[in-house]
């Protein structure tokens, strides 16, 4: 491997099922490439429906014994996993940068962020409380208990290849569920590295299973249609989420769906502009704009629009673009050619519809998957770029006059994942926070996700919540007990 792609002991080239490292039954494999360099990292098994059924069966066999452990015993296993993840933070970050492309500093941050979900749910699993209920007659006693859903399927994306796994596996395992994980074909190596560390932590065979595959439709259909799987957790596009939801309907699976976003970022005239610029930079450009909660539309009140645009442009022009392994890199590559083509097309369409390119607006010479960090001004509310999740380092600026206009523009979307706004008038802060139709709102803050708070959206941005106590509830069933003949 090259200097930018070092040999790493946690890179695995086999799938992980039932405590074994294994090939696909048919012997097929697919390549995992470094998006910054185009170099081959390794090949992994290309598993199909039959392989997936084996993984589900392994999870089913392991689930009763795992659920029978006390919450504290499961907690101890999860803590051991958490500690191993943090002990291997540097290597996990290098694997992530190699296969996903994000700058190494961001990758290290994601490893710590991802590990925090394991740590949090190691504790929260001990608090899966039932309750007692006053009876409806003197000889009755009523209570509820919590029990694990059972076998869980998780389909995870490439943009956060560690955190999106731990945010699902942490609560699932803490609740007493077992899990079958289908990571994105672009980033299977982070998932396999996590499995290797889980194995070292003493998590039993069959509790965690990793199905690597380039056959997303076939594997997804098996996970959705198989009666043994009692819950599906998916992070990805709204289009695919709707498809999976339909496929799960026949077996009435529990669902957690974290889907697309179209996040507004509103700057009011009383905002601290320096803080707003810092928030916009963090929210818009991390991971080269490839996050579901990225600021997708930046709405700036007319009286401060030009000053904000000037400050933002100065910062964006200074970004260092390149291989994520490079010293000081701030913007890495897009994940693949389709992503790069989409970003270029959206910028061209926006310009054709009247937007002006203030910064960037073209491919970057670092390589075919790199795009210049871009700012567009003069973007009308009906510009096509405001209707799509950009998933790239492009910030469209929209000028507005009044609070009511900003809220109307912000809510004019079928999505409702995250929103952000900056302002200091306390009355307006409350009004706007309540009127924005989003599951999460950052107020004078551009980075809002944490294991401590419930993450999720409304409208077509999904179902359920991840993180916090709500995240554990997603993997538990409530059973009602009625005791008679007590008197």
Regions found by a protein language model. Give the residues of each.
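Residue-level signal for inorganic ion chemistry
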Residues: 38, 59, 74, 96, ...
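Short, well-ordered beta-strand elements within core beta-sheets of diverse protein domains
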Residues: 41-47, 62-68, 154, 265-268, ...
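Glycine-rich loop-to-alpha-helix module at the N-terminal edge of alpha/beta enzyme cores
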Residues: 39-128, 139
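Hydrophobic face of amphipathic alpha-helices that form TPR/SEL1-like repeat modules
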Residues: 1-36
């Amino acid at each position: 491997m090259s200097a930018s792609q070092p040999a790493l002991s946690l890179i695995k080239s086999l799938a992980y099922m039932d405590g074994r490292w294994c090939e696909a039954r048919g012997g097929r494999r697919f390549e995992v490439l470094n998006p910054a360099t185009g170099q081959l990292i390794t090949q992994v098994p290309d598993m199909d429906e039959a392989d997936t059924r084996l993984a589900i069966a392994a999870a089913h066999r392991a689930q009763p014994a795992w659920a029978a452990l006390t919450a504290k015993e499961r907690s101890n296993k999860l803590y051991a996993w958490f500690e191993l993840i943090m002990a291997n933070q540097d290597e996990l970050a290098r694997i992530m940068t190699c296969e996903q492309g994000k700058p190494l500093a961001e990758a290290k941050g994601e490893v710590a962020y991802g590990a925090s979900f394991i740590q949090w749910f190691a504790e929260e699993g001990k608090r899966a409380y039932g309750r007692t209920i006053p009876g409806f007659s003197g000889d009755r006693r009523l209570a509820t208990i919590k029990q694990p859903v059972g076998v869980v399927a998780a389909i995870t994306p490439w943009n956060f290849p560690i955190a999106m796994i731990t945010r699902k596996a942490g609560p699932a395992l803490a609740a007493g569920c077992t899990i079958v994980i289908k990571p994105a074909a672009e980033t299977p190596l982070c998932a396999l590295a996590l499995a290797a560390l889980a194995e070292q932590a003493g998590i039993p065979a069959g509790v965690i299973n990793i199905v690597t595959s380039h056959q997303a439709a076939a594997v997804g259909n098996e996970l959705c249609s198989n009666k043994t799987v009692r819950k599906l957790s998916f992070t990805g596009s709204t289009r695919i989420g709707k498809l999976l939801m339909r496929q799960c309907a026949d077996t009435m699976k529990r669902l957690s769906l974290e889907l697309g976003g179209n996040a507004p970022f509103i700057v009011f005239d009383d905002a601290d502009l320096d803080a707003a610029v810092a928030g916009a930079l963090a929210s818009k450009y991390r991971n080269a704009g490839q996050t579901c909660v990225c600021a997708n539309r930046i709405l700036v009140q007319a009286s401060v629009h030009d000053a904000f645009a000037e400050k933002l442009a100065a910062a964006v022009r200074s970004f260092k673009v390149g291989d994520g392994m490079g010293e000081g890199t701030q913007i890495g590559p897009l994940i693949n050619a389709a992503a790069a083509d989409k970003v270029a097309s959206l910028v061209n369409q926006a310009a054709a519809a009247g937007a002006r390119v203030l910064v960037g607006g073209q491919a970057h010479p670092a390589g075919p998957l790199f795009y210049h960090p871009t700012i567009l001004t003069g973007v009308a509310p009906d510009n096509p770029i405001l209707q799509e999740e950009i998933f790239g380092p492009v910030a469209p600026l929209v000028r507005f006059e009044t609070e009511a206009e900003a809220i109307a523009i912000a809510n004019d979307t079928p999505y409702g994942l995250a929103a952000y706004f900056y302002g200091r008038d306390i009355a307006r802060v409350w009004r706007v926070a309540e009127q924005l139709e989003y599951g999460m709102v950052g107020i004078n803050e551009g980075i809002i996700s944490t294991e401590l708070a419930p993450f999720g959206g409304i409208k077509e941005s999904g179902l359920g919540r991840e993180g916090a106590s709500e995240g554990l509830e997603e993997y538990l069933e409530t059973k009602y007990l009625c005791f008679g003949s007590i008197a």
